């Protein structure tokens, strides 16, 4: 597995995951907006634009002001961890991505610390936010993404559900900057209820598949999110996956 970090002209930092055997197929210049590593919302924050209310709290006013402060790699516990730091006002965020020897998966979490004397109410904090899920070509490739989910009412008993992104309405809109989000995950106090906290993404043409799940002893959800970047040149889009408990 290969991970690449990117920083745009606005100082936002994001990353891309691909199989190591496919890293040379990543397009050098993305035609989509960089997905920030940190997604959070404070009480009183502005919502992220048209029709976002009720769909998502991501891309809040605080996220737009967060700045990158540093990155380091730490080798410990039989693996290595990449810590990327950010700050806004008196809040400090650390995005931790950990690789363990012998595993073809990585663990991701985000921590936040209030270093000021003013109380801040954190309404939402994503454990991870991963965009650019198919970084192998530019533009829109219709009916090329299969999304896998696992409906369940108890424990690990579930069936596998497969749908195209278009079937879940994760498609571009004719309204510039419109936001659309599909969420699922754990609700209530049962081990699982409604959906196992898992999602798989398959690039049909490239025969590449990745899966994501969260581990938290509380209700939480995974969100699939799409937002176009504008009509100035071509309409371009990517699906983003986020999780929080």
Feature map (PLM): residue ranges:
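Carbohydrate-binding surfaces of carbohydrate-active enzymes
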Residues: 245
């Amino acid at each position: 597995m290969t991970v690449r970090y990117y920083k745009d002209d606005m100082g936002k930092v994001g990353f891309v995951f691909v199989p190591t055997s496919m890293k040379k197929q990543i397009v050098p210049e993305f035609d989509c907006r960089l997905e920030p590593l940190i997604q959070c919302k404070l009480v009183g924050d502005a919502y992220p634009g048209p029709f976002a209310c009720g769909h998502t709290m991501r891309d809040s006013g605080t996220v737009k002001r967060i700045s990158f402060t540093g990155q380091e790699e730490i080798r410990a516990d039989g693996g290595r961890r990449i810590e990327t730091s950010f700050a806004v006002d008196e809040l400090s965020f650390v995005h931790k991505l950990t690789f363990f020897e012998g595993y073809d998966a990585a663990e991701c979490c985000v921590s936040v610390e209030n270093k000021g004397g003013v109380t801040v109410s954190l309404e939402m904090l994503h454990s991870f936010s991963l965009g650019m899920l198919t970084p192998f070509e530019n533009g829109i490739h219709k009916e090329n993404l299969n999304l896998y989910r696992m409906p369940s009412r108890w424990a690990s008993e579930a069936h596998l559900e497969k749908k195209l992104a278009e079937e879940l309405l994760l498609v571009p809109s004719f309204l510039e900057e419109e936001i659309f989000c599909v969420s699922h995950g754990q609700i209530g106090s049962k081990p699982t209820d409604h959906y196992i906290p898992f999602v798989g993404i398959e690039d049909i043409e490239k025969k590449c598949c990745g899966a994501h799940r969260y581990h938290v002893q509380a209700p939480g959800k995974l969100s699939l999110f799409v937002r176009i970047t504008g009509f100035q040149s071509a309409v371009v889009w990517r699906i983003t996956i986020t999780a929080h408990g």
